[in-house]
Regions:
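Conserved, mostly hydrophobic/aromatic
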Residues: 19, 42, 81, 99, ...
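N-terminal capping/small domains of soluble enzymes
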Residues: 1-97, 102-104
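Catalytic cores of alpha/beta
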Residues: 28-33, 109-119, 171-184, 234-236, ...
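Short beta-strand/loop segments at the ligand-binding rim of alpha/beta enzyme cores
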Residues: 12-18, 93-99, 158-169, 233-243
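Glycine/Thr-rich beta-alpha phosphate-binding loop at enzyme active sites
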Residues: 67-68, 131-146, 177-234, 238, ...
Length: 305
């Protein structure tokens, strides 16, 4: 009998499969399709201090290797999430959940995390530092180790919950950013977020997305995710949530060998709503095929002699 259990920042997971933020809503839509309590946990929709209506449509475009999205962090704001979304979520998901947090200043990140700190069902805070710093010329907080560390410290000061910093693949040196986050008090890191990309409509001769650019996700970015998880594992000693183009149980094993403790599944949920359930069902079979008894034994296994 194989063992799929892992521990993420001190909290146990039945398995390492985590639907990624922005691809799973607040869970209750998917709960109408299958019992989402089979998941390790999930990261709910990115939450900001005030409501955001998101970018104009169209927001989604396809490419051969996956999807481009430019949703623009549409969400009702942290107060409405606490008042309306979390009570509904509790009815369908009976495990700790991961709260994804976004902000446009260091203070804003801290305010949102402070408000979520008292929510019992929130097990982890996943802090998305791919957002533009409106006080720093618009560059993403995660593009530079110093700004990434500043956000990490500010969040660490206002919460006792495990803090997982979600890193941008656009950083010049993602391992240096991860190291800075660890030194500033992060309990874990998650990577990779989407990559900036664009498609152009040949008939209109204009970008397919109303916003012009969007985040690339899907199988086309998986090898990049594996490389970056591998690099970050060698730079830090805190757990990694690996993600980026995951669509099979074998992908989960590959990212864990690269160094991930848990694995996020994003675009696959938009293509097939039951994707995570299938990956979880397939995981024991894949483990047996490759002679893996316990998942924790293979974390970072590709680095060993």
């Amino acid at each position: 009998m194989v063992n799929t259990a892992v521990t993420l920042c001190g909290l146990p997971l039945e398995n390492p499969v985590i639907p990624a933020s922005g691809t799973f809503g607040y869970g209750y839509e998917f709960a109408q399709i299958y019992d989402i309590n089979c998941l390790g946990t999930f990261s709910f929709k990115g939450t900001t201090l005030t409501p955001r209506y998101g970018n104009p449509t169209p927001r989604i475009a396809e490419y051969a290797g996956g999807l481009l999205n430019s949703v623009g962090l549409q969400n009702p704001g942290v107060e409405a999430v606490i008042r309306e979304e979390l009570p509904r979520l509790r009815e369908v998901f009976h495990k700790p959940v991961m709260a994804n947090v976004s902000g446009f200043s260091v203070e804003e990140y801290a305010q949102v995390c402070r408000q979520l700190d008292s929510e019992e069902q929130v097990g982890w805070l996943e802090v998305n530092i791919s957002c533009p710093n409106v006080h720093g010329g618009g560059a993403a907080f995660g593009a530079d180790p110093r700004t990434a560390a500043a956000v990490t410290r500010a969040v660490r000061d206002v919460t006792k919950k495990p803090v997982i910093m979600k890193l941008s693949p656009a950083a010049a040196d993602i391992a240096a950013v991860a190291r800075a986050c660890q030194e500033a008090g992060a309990d874990g890191v998650s990577l990779i977020n989407t990559l900036p990309g664009m498609r152009i409509d040949l008939k209109r001769r204009r970008p397919l997305l109303a916003n012009g650019t969007g985040g690339m996700s899907g199988p086309g970015i998986f090898p990049l995710a594996v490389r970056m998880v591998y690099q970050v594992y060698e730079a830090v000693s805190i757990p990694i949530v690996g993600m980026g183009g995951v669509s099979t149980a074998e992908d989960v094993l590959e990212l864990m060998l690269a160094g991930a403790t848990a694995v996020g599944v994003g675009a696959a949920n938009l293509v097939e709503p039951r994707a995570c359930r299938k990956i979880i069902q397939d995981l024991p079979v894949a483990m047996e095929r490759y002679g893996i008894q316990q998942l924790t034994d293979i974390i970072g296994g590709a680095h060993h002699g």
